[in-house]
Amino acid sequence: SKGAYVTNNKQPITFKVVDEAGGSGVNLSTVKIKVDGTTYTTSSTGMVSKGITNGYQFVFTPQTALKDGNHTITINASDNDGNAATTVSSTFTIDTVPPTLTISSPAAGLITNKSALTVTGKTNDATSSPITLTMTLNGTSLGSVAVETDGSFSKAVTLAEGTNSIVVTAKDGAGQTTSITLSVKLDTTVPVLKGITLAPNPVSTSASVAITVEVS
């Protein structure tokens, strides 16, 4: 379809050429498809055709991988009386590379005593921007996250006591995704002083004393 994103750089291209009922029929020798300036005919390698009502259906598979980016298709044909059909053009975009995604903060494995946390980072896709960014916290969706024109993003979250799992996912226009999972621990438990041990028992004012404190 026009303007479609595809991830296959040898994407088969399907098209139909038909003549009106009662017409002279499609002249197969005139059917041509042009992909980015290179013209292919019904006898070209990669072209397959089959008859349908009043015409033909064609499937052309590029034999050389197309580059990532935008591509233009142009189709021409005539009937057996020499009447040329109106040229049809379409475009599509190939994107074989998932979006980039980096997390600036927090650091992986962070342990904090503050429940308020801001996740920041950057994402980009050279071929099929804009990026759709989503985030989950402990399996619960936090919805979409706004991405600035430079690819940066920022999202405030509230941590639960204990280990928290944060998953950030970037999705490009072709549907390819990149995800990063962060583990952040919230520890607000106050340490408890359980006991003090002096060893050995002091027997004189000049004795050396070792003090051990047990905290949990």
Where are these regions (language model features)?
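Aromatic/hydrophobic beta-strand junction motif of beta-rich domains
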Residues: 13-19, 119-123, 211-215
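Proline-centered linker/hinge motifs at extracellular inter-domain junctions
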Residues: 1, 26, 98-99, 106, ...
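Short, solvent-exposed loop/linker segments at the N-terminal edge
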Residues: 3-9, 108-115, 201-207
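Flexible, low-complexity linkers/stalks enriched in Thr/Pro that connect modular domains
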Residues: 89-102, 182-191
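Surface-exposed, short loops/turns at beta-strand junctions within beta-sandwich domains
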Residues: 62-70, 156-163
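Short strand-edge motifs at loop-to-beta-strand transitions and within beta-strands
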Residues: 54-60, 151-155
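Extracellular acidic loop/turn motifs
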Residues: 19-28, 124-133, 216
